[in-house]
């Protein structure tokens, strides 16, 4: 399920120090976009485009948008503010070289860290606002266009399943997922096990817990999007 964030209107500028930011909705390349014209006036600081947006957030999600621009190398920050306005989550892309042509950007929820607020952590449950911030690196002045902002629900809906080349009674492939363990038959010269997530998922890592009584052995870990390779 994908929810499209409303178009390039209703964004408000926030700046620090003497920095300047002008926001305007434009049509470019057949797309409605938010245009950010910024000028750090030879100093540091930040400029922010902020929009109020109330929405229940899925447990796992991805934020996608298209980006292009021109200007010096600076940091781009994406911030999510909860409905209280006090808790903030942030993704920082440091030293961003603005692409002259439209580039699709994708930020997974696991890469959006809790930044500050009284909740002291956890995930965002109800969105209250969204911010795109340009934080001075080289500073200078330039223009950024942002379009097609979407929130994609990536919460798994199906349980993973497992299959194996063989198994002894009581230690079938499913045991690898349930914690009881998987054991191939002694005569299985080339044992293998496949764990299928059924639907696309972001995999942060894999922990292999070797059963205490199992003899030491080498193994390979392979990954595939469709199981064909």
Task: Annotate each PLM feature.
Residues 1-6, 58, 98-102, 179-180:
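Solvent-exposed, conformationally flexible loop/turn segments
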Residues 3-4, 11-13, 17, 24-32, ...:
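Disordered, acidic Ser/Thr/Pro-rich linker "stalks" and the adjacent N-terminal cap
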Residues 7-13, 119-129, 140-143, 193:
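Extracellular glycan-associated modules
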Residues 22-31, 67, 117-129, 199:
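Short, surface-exposed loop and linker segments with low hydrophobicity and enrichment for Pro/Ser/Thr
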Residues 38-118, 139-145, 150, 207-229:
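Extracellular ligand-binding interfaces
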Residues 63-65, 107, 127-135, 191-209, ...:
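Hydrophobic/aromatic beta-strand segments within beta-rich folds
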């Amino acid at each position: 399920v994908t929810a499209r964030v409303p178009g390039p209107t209703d964004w408000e500028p926030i700046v620090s120090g003497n920095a300047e930011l002008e926001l305007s909705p434009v049509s470019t390349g057949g797309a409605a976009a938010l245009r950010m014209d910024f000028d750090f006036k030879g100093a540091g600081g930040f400029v922010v485009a902020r929009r109020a947006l109330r929405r229940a957030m899925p447990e796992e999600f991805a934020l996608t948008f298209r980006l292009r621009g021109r200007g010096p190398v600076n940091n781009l920050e994406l911030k999510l503010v909860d409905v209280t306005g006090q808790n903030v989550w942030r993704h920082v892309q440091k030293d961003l070289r603005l692409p002259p042509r439209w580039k699709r950007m994708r930020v997974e929820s696991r890469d959006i860290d809790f930044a500050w607020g009284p909740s002291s952590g956890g995930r965002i449950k109800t969105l209250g606002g969204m911010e795109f911030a340009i934080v001075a690196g080289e500073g200078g002045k330039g223009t950024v266009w942002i379009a097609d902002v979407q929130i994609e629900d990536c919460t798994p809906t199906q349980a993973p399943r497992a299959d194996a080349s063989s198994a002894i009674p009581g230690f079938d492939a499913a045991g690898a997922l349930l914690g009881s363990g998987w054991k191939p038959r002694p005569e299985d010269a080339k044992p293998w096990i496949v764990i299928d997530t059924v639907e696309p998922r972001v995999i942060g890592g894999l922990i292999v817990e070797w059963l205490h009584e199992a003899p030491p052995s080498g193994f390979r870990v392979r990954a595939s999007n469709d199981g064909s390779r």
